[in-house]
């Protein structure tokens, strides 16, 4: 399309400059800016220069925008949190049981051929390495083993001993309660003066001098028989002394023996005392039930 013819007489000086500038830019945009520049620079010279290149003919570098969003974005990269990186100089966390196990093995290797009974560090490691519960049946050599089959066996044995101990305690408790209730209601129905009261004159109305003597005789006899059977069964099953290993007193003595080794010699005596104290607790429990029964009976009088 040809450019319109404009009468230059009617144009002002500013419009003429604008038209010249537009014509010059139109010529430059056709890719001949470099040739025209070299032609201008070569005027008046016998040698034409061709080493100059116009900025209009230079190729523009493609600029990449970092702010453009990708066409497809994987949401899992945003929703999945990155793995925790430990601080510099810090390794991955280890199992505390494995750490104590390794320290105990190293201490045992150092103490081979020497007496480590007075070594506080070795005693601390043994105390941490022992498993809680009635596991005194497990020797110290098996506690330091790494065989998974043997470890599983000891865990099952520990669970069985705990279950067996609770089962036998429940059985004896049930028998004691039934025997005491039968003894009480038998004498209550067979003896007319078998009653209790808060008032002295009511108790003095009894025709017999000791109306509850037979009841307490049978009660004491049954308690002695049940306590003896309890001790015999638990001792034969190996649960009598094992049940006291979790006592807070023995744990405190184990910790104190690291400072005072003499306490270690008193632990068997304390464990035996705790066992007999448990037998005494059985008798006290039966007496408590009798007191409750007589207290309920006193409301009727």
Swiss-Prot record:
| Residues covered by region (Disordered) | 42-93
List all Low complexity biased stretches. 42-55
Its main subcellular localisation, reduced to a broad class, is endoplasmic reticulum
Query: Topology in the membrane?
Result: Multi-pass membrane protein
Q: Which InterPro entries match?
A: GET2, Get2/sif1
Which stretches face the Lumenal side? 189-214, 300-301
Q: Which domain of life is it from?
A: Eukaryota
Those parts of the protein on the Cytoplasmic side are: 1-167, 235-278
Where found?
Endoplasmic reticulum membrane; Golgi apparatus membrane
- Which residue ranges traverse the bilayer? 168-188, 215-234, 279-299
Gene Ontology annotations of biological process type:
protein insertion into ER membrane; retrograde vesicle-mediated transport, Golgi to endoplasmic reticulum
List, as start-end ranges, the regions of compositional bias called Basic and acidic residues: 56-67
Keywords from the UniProt entry = Endoplasmic reticulum, ER-Golgi transport, Golgi apparatus, Membrane, Transmembrane, Transmembrane helix, Transport
Give the family, as the similarity comment puts it: Belongs to the GET2 family.
| SUBUNIT field | Component of the Golgi to ER traffic (GET) complex, which is composed of GET1, GET2 and GET3. Within the complex, GET1 and GET2 form a heterotetramer which is stabilized by phosphatidylinositol binding and which binds to the GET3 homodimer.
Task of the protein: Required for the post-translational delivery of tail-anchored (TA) proteins to the endoplasmic reticulum. Together with GET1, acts as a membrane receptor for soluble GET3, which recognizes and selectively binds the transmembrane domain of TA proteins in the cytosol. The GET complex cooperates with the HDEL receptor ERD2 to mediate the ATP-dependent retrieval of resident ER proteins that contain a C-terminal H-D-E-L retention signal from the Golgi to the ER.
Q: This protein is called what?
A: Golgi to ER traffic protein 2
């Amino acid at each position: 399309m040809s450019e319109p013819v404009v009468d230059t007489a009617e144009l002002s000086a500013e419009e003429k400059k604008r038209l010249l500038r537009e014509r010059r830019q139109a010529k430059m945009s056709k890719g001949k800016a470099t040739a025209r520049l070299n032609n201008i620079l070569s005027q008046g010279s016998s040698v034409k220069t061709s080493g100059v290149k116009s900025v209009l003919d230079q190729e523009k570098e493609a600029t990449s925008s970092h702010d453009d969003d990708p066409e497809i974005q994987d949401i899992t990269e945003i929703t999945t949190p990155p793995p925790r990186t430990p601080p510099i100089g810090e390794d991955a966390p280890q199992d505390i049981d494995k750490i104590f196990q390794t320290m105990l093995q190293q201490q045992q290797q150092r103490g081979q051929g020497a007496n480590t009974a007075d070594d506080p560090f070795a005693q601390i490691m043994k105390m941490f390495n022992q498993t809680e519960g009635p596991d005194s049946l497990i020797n110290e050599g098996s506690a330091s083993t790494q065989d998974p089959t043997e470890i599983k066996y000891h865990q099952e044995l520990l669970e069985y001993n705990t279950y067996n101990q609770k089962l036998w305690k429940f059985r004896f408790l049930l028998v004691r309660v039934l025997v005491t209730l039968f003894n009480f209601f038998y004498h209550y129905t067979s003896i007319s003066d078998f009653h209790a009261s808060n008032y002295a004159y009511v108790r003095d109305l009894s025709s017999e001098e000791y109306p509850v003597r037979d009841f307490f005789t049978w009660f004491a006899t049954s308690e002695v028989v049940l306590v003896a059977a309890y001790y015999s069964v638990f001792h034969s099953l190996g649960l009598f002394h094992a049940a006291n290993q979790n006592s807070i007193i023995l744990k405190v003595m184990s910790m104190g023996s690291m400072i005072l080794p003499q306490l270690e010699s008193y632990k068997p005596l304390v464990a035996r005392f705790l066992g007999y104290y448990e037998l005494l607790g059985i008798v006290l429990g039966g007496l408590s039930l009798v007191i409750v029964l007589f207290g309920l009976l006193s409301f009727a009088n």
